[in-house]
Amino acid sequence: MAKVVGIDLGTTNSVIAVMEGGKPTVIPNKEGLRTTPSVVAYTKKQDKLVGQIAKRQAVMNPENTFYSVKRFIGRKKDELGDELKQSSYNVKTDINSNVKLECPALSKDFAPEEISAQVLRKLVEDASTYLGQQVTQAVITVPAYFNDSQRQATKDAGQIAGLDVLRIINEPTAASLSYGLDKKNNETILVFDLGGGTFDVSILEVGDGVFEVLSTSGDTHLGGDDFDRKIVEWLIHEFSHDEGINLGKDRQALQRLTEAAEKAKMELSSLAQTDINLPFITSTDTGPKHLEKNITRAKFEYLCQDLINRCEIPVNNALKDAQLSSGNIDEIVLVGGSTRIPAIQQLVKKMIGKDPNQSVNPDEVVAIGAAVQAGVLAGEVKDILLLDVTPLSLGVETLGGVMTKIIDRNTTVPTKKSEIFSTAVDNQPNVEIHVLQGEREFTKDNKSLGTFRLDGIMPAPRGVPQIEVIFDIDANGILSVKAKDKGTGKEQSITITGASTLPKEEVEKLVKEAEENSELDKHKREQIDLKNQADALCYQSQNQINELKDKISEDEKQNVQKLIDSLKLSIQEDDYEKIKDIQNQLQQVMMNIGKQVYSSTQQDNSKTEDGSVIDTNSKEA
């Protein structure tokens, strides 16, 4: 039976899990790690790198290394905030103001969905190898506060990666599935999910297989990246003050600062202070410049105080919408690596009045919950009822640029609701339906999801025609809207695919390209692996002949050195056939040397102290 996997497509890291033997299990990637950096890079030779290997080369290739892409997915450029400040790569827009990521190495612009699709593809390929069968179906998580465009864009990313996305599930809800899977007694839990790029708070009733979301709130412009940025800005300011040089204008330096800031943030979760040392961060006519700074936890908390304070608002909103007080919360579940920050844990404890539950791994809990939901859809998990909600209100634009809500936020999904509207002028032949998402009173302040037109309305005085507008949200939280003239029976519908996501034709084209390039990508990956293996063999062989210099002849040493030099040259020239050939030769030579040294050592050990040889085959009479 085909496996359905659960995927936490994160801003910083991604995780994939599956139900095995009735238990959710995290699948390690090809490198043996349980989390995969959500990083994609393209080298000057146009090789594609994904995950840890892409992250490692980011400093040397900042303009072609794409990270934290989740912060751009499903958004237009005017919806972005500080996200643009911390990117070492160039963020552009197309003619429709959709976000595009520039890749100089390929002379190409990517949609964020395409980059996310590469991360998904790696996760799925590694999972397929681990499970011994092809994975084609998945449940993918999104922040609870993602709007319709962002959800649809995430689904598109899955499709581009060759996946049938069975369900889009909210991250806090997935976390609750993981936490409450074996809970029999009813509990009211607050899920505090602070990830790399987004922040969600959900309140749920959990118990005996029923998971009901009471409310959700959040901030899609707040995450661990913002805490890193505070340290980066401080380092730039301090270095400018000390040296008179603005490191923020140097992409390579900015990438090094970002990595150092993330490392310092993580260290300050367990240490009172840490040092940031970046030698040769830049240079001037007087020579190289080094950055050396000490940062204390108190200083870090001072720099990030406004971010910490922002975490309070969604918590209060979620409690208010659920009509609960902090005293009604039985457990607090922390999700996301950023919840390891001590100041965040202290804030949660102060607001709710109890210590957070530490029984779940904040990095893996969402993927594990997604695997449970995948198990439900595959029929492997029984007796689970999940009642999720829509995070933001949905409605249409009415006369005067006002948003009229049809579905209120925190309504349980799937759901279907309708309202009757009419014409604004006499003999109006058509109406334009402008679909909106948000909580503000006026159209201009809310997110536009799309427009469509209903034609063929019978001539009549204004206010007479009856136009029924029906909103239908599916279990993925994705919206369809239908308008119907009750007089003529004519109707028009639209599935909201997100105003800032890729058109359907473009998605289909990218899916086809991905399928066509699958073998090419696999071949390129094999070539990279071959070069890495060959490089490792050169290193090991060099070490061995240095260690065994007294035990092997000069001719053997020269032969090995000649093969090592030839192999290194072949690696530089990307001559893969030659790499294979020389690699095999070098392996054989090193194996023979190993046998020879081992045999010689055995003979030495079998000699007596006076130099005579013991006949090990002789028997005493």
UniProtKB/Swiss-Prot annotation:
<dbReference type="GO" id="GO:0140662">
    <property type="term" value="F:ATP-dependent protein folding chaperone"/>
</dbReference>
<comment type="function">
    <text>Acts as a chaperone.</text>
</comment>
<keyword id="KW-0143">Chaperone</keyword>
<dbReference type="GO" id="GO:0009507">
    <property type="term" value="C:chloroplast"/>
</dbReference>
<keyword id="KW-0067">ATP-binding</keyword>
<feature type="region of interest" description="Disordered">
    <location>
        <begin position="597"/>
        <end position="621"/>
    </location>
</feature>
<dbReference type="InterPro" id="IPR029047">
    <property type="entry name" value="HSP70_peptide-bd_sf"/>
</dbReference>
<keyword id="KW-0150">Chloroplast</keyword>
<dbReference type="InterPro" id="IPR012725">
    <property type="entry name" value="Chaperone_DnaK"/>
</dbReference>
<dbReference type="GO" id="GO:0005524">
    <property type="term" value="F:ATP binding"/>
</dbReference>
<dbReference type="Pfam" id="PF00012">
    <property type="entry name" value="HSP70"/>
</dbReference>
<dbReference type="GO" id="GO:0051082">
    <property type="term" value="F:unfolded protein binding"/>
</dbReference>
<protein>
    <recommendedName>
        <fullName>Chaperone protein dnaK</fullName>
    </recommendedName>
</protein>
<comment type="similarity">
    <text>Belongs to the heat shock protein 70 family.</text>
</comment>
<dbReference type="InterPro" id="IPR043129">
    <property type="entry name" value="ATPase_NBD"/>
</dbReference>
<dbReference type="InterPro" id="IPR029048">
    <property type="entry name" value="HSP70_C_sf"/>
</dbReference>
<keyword id="KW-0934">Plastid</keyword>
<dbReference type="InterPro" id="IPR018181">
    <property type="entry name" value="Heat_shock_70_CS"/>
</dbReference>
<keyword id="KW-0547">Nucleotide-binding</keyword>
<dbReference type="InterPro" id="IPR013126">
    <property type="entry name" value="Hsp_70_fam"/>
</dbReference>
